Amino acid sequence: MASNATFEVEIYGNTTKFENSLRGVNTAMSGLRGEAKNLREALKLDPTNTDKMAQLQKNLQTQLGLSRDKATKLKEELSTVDKGTSAGQKKWLQLTRDLGTAETQANRLEGEIKQVEGAISSGSWDIDAKMDTKGVNSGIDGMKSRFSGLREIAVGVFRQIGSSAISAVGNGLRGWISDAMDTQTAMIALKNTMKFKGNGQDFDYVSKSMQKLARDTNANSEDTLKLSTTFIGLGDSAKTAVGKTEALVKANQAFGGTGENLKGVAQAYGQMSASGKVTAENINQLTDNNTALSASLKDTVMQMNPQLKQYGSFNEAVSNGAVSMDMLDKAMQKAADGSSGATKTIRDTWSGFNEDLSQALLPTLEA
């Protein structure tokens, strides 16, 4: 990729410019994953369409180039981190995990490109173009068994050295304890909010639902808990808050969004929910973090609300204040309802594994 301030990527037939940074790469990748998903669906319906195969091949090759570029950027950033401070250690851990994900993603893409090349050669989409995660899952199961004593180790560490535990234990454990602490803080905020709103009796239902959602998707408990807390704070019932959070998280993943993308999507959506207004600024923020999801929501809102056609476009309807949060909520739910068959990637599987371990450590914080 060029070293200038921006780079260009073709998505859905349109050339788009992105900031030449990790954030820009993540945004471009999100849009490309959404396009790849649509191309695969189209090939299931028209398995001899070699033009679609060629488009998918080009898409995957672009993703591969971006993944390699991301790995290079992460290595460069890692080399500048000061591991002598707790903040530096936390940043180093996050960057190391992101680097592993980027390199794994590149390996997966190389395999998918070979599958598509085979389909082009045969002239038929007669392959199951999903990543085989059997080996990955067995590897993760092995890691889980090796960490069966994780809780006992963590309890011992906390009792012996208290607050300095994070900097004293191994790299992986340090990251999981940090995640567990973030989850605990988010749980306390949820509990206090629910008590204040008068529905504290539903805390167990909401907290368990959010933890399960995090295990089943590429989100983490901290983000799902914070999002449900926002909805409850705005007056939603426990059931409604859980439903809205599940819809947002599942839709983000279904349209190629990562757990990191979810933070930006959730922030934009939460701000609109809090103000009760759909704004161009927040929609742009949502687009920056998940291009494919944003495009789908815009199209779905227009289809579900024929009265908006008088404005010519979704953006014009927003500018005129004609798009409500209720419209957006229903469109988000529809996007989530269509995601039940979404393929899990290696990254999603790994995110679930990290979440399992982080949640397993929660009891140690009260030991």
Swiss-Prot record:
Cell compartments where the protein resides: Virion
Protein family per UniProt: Belongs to the skunalikevirus tape measure protein family.
Protein name in the entry: Tape measure protein
Keywords: Viral release from host cell, Viral tail assembly, Virion
Primary localization class, coarse: virion
Top-rank lineage group of the source organism: Viruses
Organism: Lactococcus phage F4-1 (Lactococcus lactis bacteriophage F4-1)
InterPro entries (alphabetical): Tape_meas_N (IPR013491)
A Gene Ontology BP annotation from the UniProt entry: viral tail assembly
Task performed by this protein: Tape measure protein. Serves as a base for tail tube protein polymerization and acts as a template for tail length determination.
GO CC terms, sorted: virion component
Pfam families: TMP_3
